[in-house]
Amino acid sequence: MTSLEELSNIASQVRRDILRMVTKAKSGHPGGSLSSTDILTALFFRVMDHDPATWTRQTAGQDAFLLSAGHLAPVLYSVLAHAGYFPVSELATLRDFGSRLQGHPSTEHNLPGIILPSGSLGQGLSAAAGIALAKRLDGDPHRVFVLCGDGESEEGQIWEAAMFAAHQGLDKLVAMTDWNGQQIDGRVEDVAGLDALEEKWTAFGWNVVVADGHDFSSILQAFEIACAAANGKPTMILFQTEMGHGVDFMAGTHQWHGKAPSEEQCAAALAQLKETLGDY
């Protein structure tokens, strides 16, 4: 079992990967990738039942993960690489022409770990609900995990999927929201506020867990609660996070939602993060 210290070390390296990938590509979304790093690190290295050696897009016999907030591709690519889905060295190809690591997850080049393309915000939760229903019909007891953004939650399709999943009683569906309070145009509360988000999901018939998205003990406890749920309801984990977490000048501002750092800024950011697993 991966220890809390090991999770912290993996997360530090993932954050370094994110910064180096986006800087080289001169394009990408570092802010939300940094805020969701701890969540995906815990999920892939402690929670999910998955095996890169036998993984297929059908995910038969193992848990499934979808990234609904597809612009957070850098964090997913790094986590997948360190989990053994493809060589870590391939991270250097983010957004290159012909690369398997497109700016948003794509199935065009058959990158292991990617079930469906994503990036058109709001669609991933619907897809995850469909996969959860399919697993139930197939007699597969495994779970489906999906990560959404809080800005993404302004999309109407999120709430259509919420109704569908609750109506179908999909208690093997675990959704997560990276609740960092920022989106491309500013603070979420200023753009289209998500007041009473916990109450909204409860009203839609979901189990709701609120957790600190940067504390591994809190994250793991939230997943434990979600995975133990067997009451005929899907579960939403609202992870309270900070945009750009881990880098002081990126933290807590929407300015780094979709902006690549310069070489100098990247160096300053990397100086704040331990190289724990070795840079690619």
PLM regions: where:
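N-terminal capping segment at the start of a domain
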Residues: 10-27, 178-180
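Cofactor-binding active-site loop characterized by glycine-rich and histidine/acidic residues
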Residues: 18-21, 34-167
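Histidine-centered active-site/metal-ligand motif
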Residues: 29, 71, 104-107, 123, ...
